[in-house]
Design a protein with these regions (language model features):
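N-terminal active-site segment of His-dependent metallophosphoesterases
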Residues: 1-56, 61
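Active-site neighborhood of phospho(di)ester-bond hydrolases with catalytic His/Asp-centered motifs
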Residues: 2-3, 36-41, 73-79, 184-187, ...
C-alpha cells in the first residue's frame, strides 16, 4: 500500500520526483508484493512547487514505473491528482490509468451511473476460481465544489450514497456467485496478512 507519492512532474520538482520514484522502486523491488495499491495523490501538479499544471506527467510516470517493475497495481484518487487548475480532470486521469499499455494495471473507471472515478473491485480467487476475498476501492471525491477557493479552504467531499449502494450490490453479487459470504482482508497486530489470504495463489 502506497499513498501520497506526490510526483509533481514539473521542472521545479524534478529532484524530489526522482527521489520519490526511486523510493517506490526500491521498496517494491525489496518487498516483491503481489499487488500494489496507491491510494491517492500520486500526482502533485501544484504550480509553485512543481512548476506545472500538468497532472498527466505525474500519473504517466507512476504508471511507467509500475509497469517496469512488472507488478500488478491499481490506484484510487486523492485531491491533488486532478486539481481544479490541472490540465486533466478526474475522468481524463481515469482514462490514463485505463490505457491498455499498462498491462499490469487493474484500475477500472467504474460505472458511469455511480459518482466518482475508480470505484472498482479486485476479486481474490483461489486456484478453483472461487472468490475468497475482495478488495473494494471507492473514490472519496476531492472537494465539495471543484474550484480554487474550495481547494484552498480544504472543503473536502466524501463518499456519496450511490457509491455505498454500489458497494452493497457488489458484495451481494459476489456472495451470490460464491454462495457464501466474502471475507474482508484483515491484518493482524503484527502486520501480517490474515491466514486465509495467505493461502490464495492467484488473482
Amino acid at each position: 500500500h502506497l499513498t501520497d507519492i506526490h510526483i509533481g512532474g514539473g521542472f521545479l520538482s524534478k529532484e524530489v520526483d526522482e527521489k520519490a520514484i526511486n523510493a517506490v522502486a526500491t521498496m517494491i523491488t525489496k518487498e516483491k508484493p503481489d499487488l500494489v495499491i496507491a491510494t491517492g495523490d500520486i500526482a502533485f501538479p501544484v504550480p509553485y512547487m512543481a512548476g506545472t499544471f500538468n497532472n498527466y506527467s505525474g500519473a504517466k510516470a507512476f504508471g511507467n514505473l509500475m509497469e517496469s517493475l512488472g507488478v500488478y497495481w491499481t490506484v484510487t484518487f486523492g485531491n491533488h491528482d486532478a486539481e481544479c487548475y490541472s490540465y486533466f480532470d478526474r475522468e481524463a486521469v481515469a482514462e490514463i490509468y485505463s490505457d491498455e499499455e499498462f498491462k499490469h494495471c487493474l484500475f477500472q473507471a467504474g460505472p458511469e451511473d455511480v459518482d466518482g472515478y475508480g470505484n472498482h473491485v479486485i476479486e481474490v480467487k483461489n486456484t478453483d476460481g472461487i472468490i475468497t476475498q475482495a478488495i473494494v476501492l471507492i473514490d472519496s471525491q476531492a472537494y465539495v465544489k471543484n474550484n480554487l477557493i474550495e481547494s484552498i479552504k480544504g472543503t473536502y467531499d466524501n463518499i456519496h450514497p450511490n457509491q455505498v449502494e454500489w458497494y452493497e450490490n457488489e458484495i451481494k453479487r459476489m456472495n451470490s456467485e460464491n454462495n457464501k459470504t466474502i471475507k474482508a482482508i484483515q491484518g493482524d497486530v503484527n502486520g501480517g496478512l490474515h491466514k486465509d489470504f495467505a493461502t490464495v495463489k492467484s488473482l
